[in-house]
Amino acid sequence: MSREALINRITNETKIQIALNLDGGKLELKESIFPNQSIIIDEHHAKQVSGSQYINVQTGIGFLDHMIHALAKHSGWSLIVECIGDLHIDDHHTAEDVGISLGMAFKQALGQIKGVKRFGHGFAPLDEALSRAVVDLSNRPFAVIELGLKREKIGDLSTEMIPHVLESFAGAVGITIHVDCLRGFNDHHRAESAFKALAIAIKEAISKTGKNDIPSTKGVLSK
């Protein structure tokens, strides 16, 4: 059974469309939310196409695109993210709503937590930076994010929004994540290693076991 999802989320602050396949492969949208797709696609978005993955992330915030691209790539997903947000105000609504919408898509694509490992962990270095992530597909939304970022912004993304994106994602999915940057002095490296570590942990947690059981002593995974 294909683990795919399509999410459309519209508020007064953002308009978002996400297509996700947790196992990679071909992915496409029937219709873009952008009025003129050829104008939107430029050097500021993250796109990568291979035989096993299709990734195209366009949030309007370059560094957010870069982080979500890294998350998708190392999780093994195929992912399309389109967002039109009120960036004339600031980056908050766009970053938060993309995190929420991505979480909604992940939850829909994963379906019942059954026949998967449930737990995952990962370490990822980027030069001097090293991050650790641990994931529990618990249906218990909780996020502990400690990245130690010092700059006010990386590109056009406020550093305070980087952990908030991950918190919003975990809350929308209903999972527990712990993400820590253990060392590093370059904030770009610290953030990117954190997203890559989370990707590795997620890839393990959603991997199929070949069984059809619910990975819980309770026999259920629900609030």
UniProtKB/Swiss-Prot annotation:
Listed Pfam families: IGPD
Residue runs in coiled coils: none
GO function terms (MF aspect): imidazoleglycerol-phosphate dehydratase activity
PROSITE patterns, alphabetized: IGP_DEHYDRATASE_1, IGP_DEHYDRATASE_2
UniProt xrefs under SUPFAM superfamilies: Ribosomal protein S5 domain 2-like
EC number assigned by the record: 4.2.1.19
Keyword Cytoplasm: no
Pathway terms, separated by semicolons: Amino-acid biosynthesis; L-histidine biosynthesis; L-histidine from 5-phospho-alpha-D-ribose 1-diphosphate: step 6/9
Gene Ontology biological process terms from the UniProt entry: L-histidine biosynthetic process
Catalytic activity: D-erythro-1-(imidazol-4-yl)glycerol 3-phosphate = 3-(imidazol-4-yl)-2-oxopropyl phosphate + H2O
Enzyme class: lyase
Family: Belongs to the imidazoleglycerol-phosphate dehydratase family.
HAMAP family cross-referenced by the UniProt entry: HisB (MF_00076)
UniProt-recorded name of the protein: Imidazoleglycerol-phosphate dehydratase
Source organism: Candida albicans
Organism lineage: Eukaryota, Fungi, Dikarya, Ascomycota, Saccharomycotina
